[in-house]
Amino acid sequence: MTPETGLIKGPDRKQRCWWGADSEDYRAYHDDEWGQPVADDQRLFEKICLEGFQAGLSWLTILRKRENFRRAFRNFDFHKVARFAQRDVDRLLQDAGIVRHRGKIESTINNAKRARELEKEFGSLAAYFWQFEPPKGERPAHLDRAALSSLAKTPTSIALSKDLKKRGWSFVGPTTAYAFMQAMGLVNDHLEGCHARRRIATARGAFSPPSKA
């Protein structure tokens, strides 16, 4: 890895963000998902929930359990998860395929109820979340590893976190909110020189952010 740029060359000889070359799982996630602009409500809900489950853990741990989470939480259909009852909490606490943390499980159910309220108000979760695409002035002029390391949270992620908490969401601190923004394409945080950066920039350029219904 080049320390200044944060780039590393994978077994396929492609330059990637340093974290995206650690394992085959990470490479696929980095190359095919991370930073692609997303407007699908279930995927948005899934991601913000999984970011909450990640708190205190590595993303690779969550990524390797993602299919188990999808099975356990009805593919993160928030209309279905919002109807979960205590028996579902008890069931999930016995599920070794997921992170068995009562607070995070109960938070996911609570957030599903709050997601339904957002859908009613904005027409979709996508319309709500894409309001928080940050202004260009908040973005670094050149994105190397040092610049990326300074972006654990930003004014926009702080604003998103505050607004979600005001609306009753939990496990949505500003660092979690920024990781969500990175993954769902509200920002392009592939480093300069990463083979995926230009492709993500093109996808973002062609993307029309949903608006409030």
Q: What name fits each language-model region?
A:
Residues 1-213:
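HhH-family (HhH-GPD) DNA N-glycosylase catalytic core used in base-excision repair
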